[in-house]
Curated annotation (Swiss-Prot):
GO terms for cellular component: plasma membrane; vacuole. It comes from the Eukaryota. It is a lipid-anchor. A lipid is attached at C210, C212 (S-geranylgeranyl cysteine). The modification Cysteine methyl ester is found at C212. GO terms for biological process: protein transport. Keywords: Cell membrane, GTP-binding, Lipoprotein, Membrane, Methylation, Nucleotide-binding, Prenylation, Protein transport, Transport. One of its GO terms (molecular function) is GTP binding. Belongs to the small GTPase superfamily. Rab family. PROSITE patterns: RAB. This is Ras-related protein RABG2. The lineage of its organism: Eukaryota, Viridiplantae, Streptophyta, Embryophyta, Tracheophyta. GTP binds at residues 16-23, 64-68, 126-129, 159-160. Signal peptide: none annotated.
Amino acid sequence: MDSLKNRTLLKVIVLGDSGVGKTSLMNQYVYKKFNKQYKATIGADFVTKELHIDEKSVTLQIWDTAGQERFQSLGAAFYRGADCCVLVYDVNNLKSFETLNNWHTEFLKQANPMEPETFPFVLIGNKTDVDGGNSRVVSNKRAIEWCGSKGNIPYHETSAKEDTNIDEAFLSVAHIALSNERKQSNDIYPRGQYHDSVTDIIDPDQSRGCAC
């Protein structure tokens, strides 16, 4: 087993409106479980996934944040130190797509990355299974165009309920986060090991997550 000090910690923040399926995506990816009963996330929580990428041992720490506006003031404490941000919307909910700009802007404001113009984002359009796709209101083309307006960020469509494209989406996130972590490795305060002030207390063999 890899020693703790040789593992790279990648911090990923998942953002989007309440009810788009952020927690369900994470729980499906980490635990292969889906809970039909919706329960809003309060504040923030996280799950972890152990990976090997390019012969490197990685702990992907995925932060699940509340979609309600009253919790957005908590952002700075959770966003800072992130290696990648995943924006999630519901392909059947136009409002959840239209608020992506707000989430994108708010993250950059709160996280305050060193190079905001090149900070990595990934977009996920979730709930593709609903009504066999007949309830969809945001087209694949429109989503890709939005990604193009943000510097051609990667886009994935998923169904947390059916476990469709979940592993592929998060593997893409992990590769992007690792690439960003390596890019930042020459900073004054090297990141990526288990000495980050926010995550010192984390046991990589234990993970927490919401039920929904």
